[in-house]
Amino acid sequence: MTAVRAPRRRAPSDGQGGFDFSRPDEIVCGVDEAGRGPLAGPVVAAAVILDPARPIDGLDDSKVLSAKKRDLLYDLIVARSHAYCVASASVDEIDTLNILHATMLAMKRAVEGLSVLPTLAQIDGNRCPTLSVRAEAIVSGDALVPSISAASILAKVTRDRMLVDLHERFPVYGFNVHAGYGTAKHLAALREHGPCEAHRRSFAPVRAALDLIR
């Protein structure tokens, strides 16, 4: 595993990678996650192999895009990428393994779930999961590498939709608004109602809420 740090800039829309026609043996996938920080819900990862013959304009770090733009790009990525896979690690796995190892597990599942085996996985951040293919960690990769940008969008949109579904089951917490992050509203609901089965009991604010009701 290697780690690369580069100046932050917007991901270019051209030269999107995936297949390198000058090196037909090289197939690159971008990998990113969503949901390491929230107090509730799974952590989600995506892996994407872009098709250079079907470029997607506007790819960027999902965090700087509006929800409307993310939804639009999500549909384009699903339609135009050569291969993609979205995977997750559950709340139970997060609490058992810890959030770092659960994130690596979700990333591994995403890469291994691709219908096309990549020769290189480019991972957002400074750590790589253990994979059967070469892996390269790229700091700020979600803003630098289009395939990682695409993965960040798939992971973010998928997880946000999961949290909307959780809101239907547990409406008192406002998961549809904050996606499980520790906002003031969420923390107040935790103190008032205690945690639900979707909360990560290994996270300190959730443990504190549990202590209040014991």
Swiss-Prot record:
Manganese or magnesium. Binds 1 divalent metal ion per monomer in the absence of substrate. May bind a second metal ion after substrate binding. It is found in: Cytoplasm. Its cofactor is Mn(2+); Mg(2+). Residues 26-214 form the RNase H type-2 domain. This is Ribonuclease HII. InterPro entries: RNase_HII, RNase_HII/HIII, RNase_HII/HIII_dom, RNaseH-like_sf, RNaseH_sf. Belongs to the RNase HII family. Keywords: Cytoplasm, Endonuclease, Hydrolase, Manganese, Metal-binding, Nuclease. It comes from Burkholderia cenocepacia (strain ATCC BAA-245 / DSM 16553 / LMG 16656 / NCTC 13227 / J2315 / CF5610) (Burkholderia cepacia (strain J2315)). Endonuclease that specifically degrades the RNA of RNA-DNA hybrids. It comes from the Bacteria. It catalyses: Endonucleolytic cleavage to 5'-phosphomonoester. One of its GO terms (biological process) is DNA replication, removal of RNA primer. Coiled coil: none annotated. A divalent metal cation binds at D32, E33, D124. Its EC number is 3.1.26.4. It is an enzyme of class 3 (hydrolase).
